[in-house]
Amino acid sequence: MAGRAGGKREFERRREILRRLADTYPGSARQLCELEFADPFQLLVATILSAQCTDERVNMVTRDLFSRYPSADALAAANPEEVERIVYPTGFFRAKAANVLKVSAAVAERGGEVPSTMEELVRLPGVGRKTANVVISVAFGEPGLPVDTHVVRLSKRLGLTLSGDPVKIEAELMSWVPPAESGGLSLRLILHGRRVCKAKKPDCASCVLADLCPSAIAP
């Protein structure tokens, strides 16, 4: 009986975490995403460029990139050196430019249509699970839970996982989060990690989850 009671309390704690995050950061996954894009292809490219780069800087770059090359066909035909020049501010510019050009060519071969399933997305050049989950949840509004460094950190601090493996964390969270809330949870954890639960100096005093968090630092 005690085990069942403990399990019920933990379930209620997790549901309350979801509720408070949704109250603090309202909106759909598309509304919560801070990357700027006009269609699934542009989000795919922006997400590739966002690796180890801020969304703000990516948006500055993609405004220029997409004004010149708004579609997969246009970007696939772009001069590689010109693409490298444009994406330079995002870091790792040669690798990112190469991936962007390859994925653009692959999407262009599909008639400009970005696939909407994990199986098909991860077959595209330079696309892993995190990028695929962003596209699935944000562009298509389907269940998907991107796991970045913020999601890893907050999931561990909140006692939602003991793992540091993004794939395992994704599976653990998806095992109890309602599918329709999965993308929103990921983005809310990311926003909370950027604004409150920072890596080095978490602001526990102003955190709406402090009383639910086993890692909270007492004031």
Residue ranges of each PLM-predicted region?
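Catalytic cores of DNA base-excision repair glycosylases
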Residues: A2-P219
